[in-house]
Amino acid sequence: MSSEHHAPIRATVEPVVAAAGLHLEECELKGQGATRTLQVLVDLPDGTEALGLDRVAAVAQEISDALDRDDPVPGPPYELEVSSPGATRTLETPRHWRRTVGHLVRIRTLEGERYTARLLEAHEDHAVVQRSHQPKKGMPVKLLDPERVDYASIRTARSEVEN
């Protein structure tokens, strides 16, 4: 579906999400015919705490009510799917990085280097991470000095679940 069809949907969904104190991460109608799904991804606007399922369920009901009232989705019926980014997410914006401070991130640089590090700070154009090194299995883990990583030097980055 083209972006001009998404605009009325977003215009209905975004104020509902904002009124709930959340950030609209994504709003996309996928599929065709009878198998269409409106996927809405919501998150907390800032902070590092997790978005609870009860809060997602509450905003999902409010979104559903607004969509029924405004009817911005043309064509056949669709299924509404509202979720949060979850424990592992792609880090694409400074806000994503700020939401992940304190957690592990897996980074792949433009040069092809891959590593996992703890995210210590997140700024508008860079992050500060701390890698660790374990020389041999069973030996203590050594924390390396914090290092600056410019977002422009990163090909991909994801938050990681800790063991």
From Swiss-Prot:
What the entry lists under Pfam families is as follows: DUF150_C, RimP_N
For this record, the Gene Ontology CC terms, alphabetical, are:
cytosol
What the protein does comes down to: Required for maturation of 30S ribosomal subunits.
Gene name tied to this protein = rimP
Species this protein is from: Kocuria rhizophila (strain ATCC 9341 / DSM 348 / NBRC 103217 / DC2201)
Indicate yes or no for the key word Zinc-finger: no
The name this protein goes by in its record: Ribosome maturation factor RimP
Q: Tell me the superkingdom of the source.
A: Bacteria
What family does this belong to?
Answer: Belongs to the RimP family.
**SUPFAM superfamilies in the record:** YhbC-like, N-terminal domain
Checking InterPro entries in the record gives:
Ribosome_maturation_RimP, RimP_C, RimP_N, RimP_N_sf
Q: Name one GO biological process term.
A: translation
